Amino acid sequence: MGWRGGWVLSLLVVGVGCGGALPEEQTEAGLAQEPTSAPEVTAEGLCLPTAAGTQRVKTILPPSEIGIPRFAMGPGGFVDFKGTLHFAVNYEDGRRGLWRSTGTDAGTTQVKGFPATGSGSLLSQLTATPTQLFFQAPDAAHGSELWVSDGTTAGTRLVKDVTPGPEDSYLTHLTAAGSTLVFFKETYDATVFTTRYELWKSDGTAAGTVRLRDFGTSVDVSYLDAKQGNALLFFVRELEGATSLWRTDGTAAGTVQVKRLDAGPDTYPNDVRTSGALTLFRLSESSGLTELWKTDGTAGGTLRLASFGPTRAVDVLGSLGAYAYVTTTSYSTQYMVIYRVPLAGGNPEPVVTLPNDYTSQGDALPFINAVSQAPGGTKLYFSVTIGSNGPAPRDTQLWVTNGTAGGTTLLRRPLSLSDEYGSPVYAVADNLVFFSAYDDATGIEPWVSNGTVAGTRLLKNIDAQASSYPHEFFRQGNRVYFSAYDDTLNAQLWSTQLSHACVAPEDAQ
């Protein structure tokens, strides 16, 4: 993957109400005072899945006419609705379908099909409330609009033609706020060359699908958001002014500005990561400063934790216990350092410096590509991409950390070295993570790890002739589903069985 434009960040890190400096660059390689070794695997009870337990669920899509596996659009948008997997299928010929699966061929069926419209709009944004499944889909009469399903064909219908006629509606931020759906309608206004942002809610009926607030055309609503409890958190930036955090619970009274974060102008949120009741994010300022923030969705619980100046790039990893974890990467030395920042306030502390074998070979800046933490987990799994002066990376690596130097381990390298396909990282438990990796013998295939080097291995060689390019790992009950390109010459629905009864490791087939 090519260089991702990041915000420049600094040597100086300041905790709330106090100051503290990062170590000088020449000391980076010696920050870790204890060896970086494999962490102890926690007793989560889940075992490494097997190749035998990894099977194609159903052949849904015909052979691809595009014929480029990494571009194949297989089943996706996985969501749990009433205890059953639901997902979208978008065919190359323009047809669309809402599907469901119980994990068997016979139990994998189409709920509702949509004929091709020629618009290119996808069936997408599946969002479940306790009793209704909302999604966006196109038809010839209404364009791409909001639909709802109760899980049956008869109970799947258009909610409302939000933009009357065949013109598409551009809907974003679909989020369940209890039994209510909240979302934004974005409309480009050609008269002022800006976008109008409107916050809407829906109860699944046309009459109950109404606008909550018109934010107008003088602001920009970030594509980043967070779900906390039954509320949606989102960021609003005045085009010539401040950036603020907002929340909505689907009511007019519950749609409020939580806090004004920065006076601006040109301040943008990045790396929004939620763990339990806490969300971390960073603000990037035009001055080159970057700030680490935390929020629990209240004004009092929305606080700046640290500031970083313009000589380093910063990525947010997440929170473990009493600390937030970030990485800082020096633009001059090209070393990445993990820091922990007290959530209660205080100076950041270095944890460990990650190795970089390419610092003397020109452009080789590391950055975080993906992060995953199991619900309630005590470890962070993350992928590091080491860039180059071209579109493809020099290296890609899977790491795990429990917040200590000794518990920070390189599990696998390389992952994907393509600039057109990045490896997903999906932690099911502290001792089970799914990802994809490259091997000379198999290409890019699904892999698993229990958080140790010895417990990191190929799950299954799905496409014996090439790479299967797995996408969208998703746990539903005792299975993990994903999309993979296989011998049907298209990406199909696959799953692997989770187990609490461990067996001796097998050779992946």
What are these regions (language model features)?
Residues M1-V8:
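Bacterial N-terminal signal peptides that target proteins for export
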Residues G15-G17:
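C-terminal motif of bacterial Sec signal peptides marking the signal peptidase cleavage site
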Residues S37, A43-Q509:
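Feature 14080 marks short, conserved micro-sites in well-ordered regions
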Residues G19-A21:
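Bacterial signal peptide processing site
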